[in-house]
Regions:
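Conserved catalytic-core motifs of eukaryotic protein kinase domains, centered on the activation segment
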Residues: 32, 37-39, 64-70, 130-133, ...
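Gly/Ala-rich beta-loop-alpha elbow adjacent to hydrolase catalytic centers
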Residues: 97, 101, 105
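Flexible "cap/lid" loop of the alpha/beta hydrolase fold
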Residues: 106-111, 116-147
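Conserved serine/cysteine hydrolase catalytic core
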Residues: 176-230, 239
Length: 272
């Protein structure tokens, strides 16, 4: 585990940095999760072992610091991650964002576009959260209510319903971080995250689990020409359910993007 000091928050973000000679991949987890919890088994697969893989715990989550005066909005997470990416001098970067980590990934790409080769999202939030989503239910509490008793209520309900993995990692979040990020999810982005995704002029791919389908986002993304991948026999928590296949699909996407870029370069040289 390593740590990165965020000056304007006087706080440390902690992360794991697995070495590799191939292009780097930065993994951004979703609400209630942590890179240190979600992606260790993914990046240990043979198909990714040559890539430099960086697993972060966002501020407020996992092993990172949990400042109470931070607003925990998507754009605020993206801002310190931009500085983090620059501090590591990352280039030719693939950014992988899951669920509510998807909007953070999208906004981060926009902030450091010249450093990013590909954006991969797994079942991302693209529009404001609606009833039925965890973030919507959490945001229905006032912040005081959630800190006083709502956080414990969500943890208990997750445990008793059998969602024990999420309960385990959620328990290491700051209640303030959970609530403020959830409220932002319900508000949506100043510019919708869907529009930001569509406007990005880089290769991008969105992954869904077969058990999550049918899904309105899948249909709309397919209709709008966004490349999609489906992993069989998994749902939303795909990195826990089948880390081997998540790794393989990620590797295949990166390889395919590289081959397309090389083909484009060779074609331009030939035409010249």
């Amino acid at each position: 585990m390593k740590e990165y000091f965020i000056d304007d928050q006087n706080a440390y973000m902690r992360y794991q940095d697995f070495p590799g000679e191939s292009s780097p991949i930065l993994f951004i987890h979703g609400l209630g999760c942590a890179g240190s919890f979600d992606y260790g088994e993914v990046v240990s697969q043979e198909c990714l072992k040559n890539h430099r893989c960086i697993l972060i715990d966002l501020l407020g989550a996992g092993y990172s610091d949990k400042p109470e005066d931070f607003d925990y909005r998507v754009s605020s997470h993206a801002a310190y991650l931009k500085s983090f990416v620059e501090s590591l001098e990352l280039t030719n970067l693939t950014i992988f964002g899951h669920s509510l980590g998807g909007p953070i990934a999208i906004e981060l790409v926009k902030l450091c576009l010249d450093r990013v080769e590909h954006l991969i999202l797994s079942e991302p939030n693209l529009d404001a959260s609606v009833s039925g989503s965890s973030s919507f239910e959490i945001a229905a509490f006032s912040e005081k209510e959630f800190v006083d008793y709502g956080f414990r209520k969500v943890l208990t309900e997750s445990q008793t319903s059998g969602n024990t993995m999420w309960a385990a990692t959620l328990s290491n979040w700051s209640p303030y971080a959970v609530h403020r990020l959830s409220v932002n999810a319900v508000q949506g982005g100043e510019v919708s995250w869907r529009k930001l995704l569509y406007d990005l002029k880089i290769p991008k791919t969105v992954i869904f689990g077969r058990k999550s389908l049918p899904d309105d986002d899948y249909e709309s993304l397919d209709r709008d020409g966004i490349p999609l991948k489906v992993i069989e026999n998994v749902g939303h928590s795909m990195a826990w359910e089948n880390p081997v296949e998540v790794a393989q699909v990620t590797s295949d996407i990166i390889k395919n993007n590289l081959s397309q870029r090389l083909e484009s370069i060779f074609r331009s040289l030939f035409l010249w």
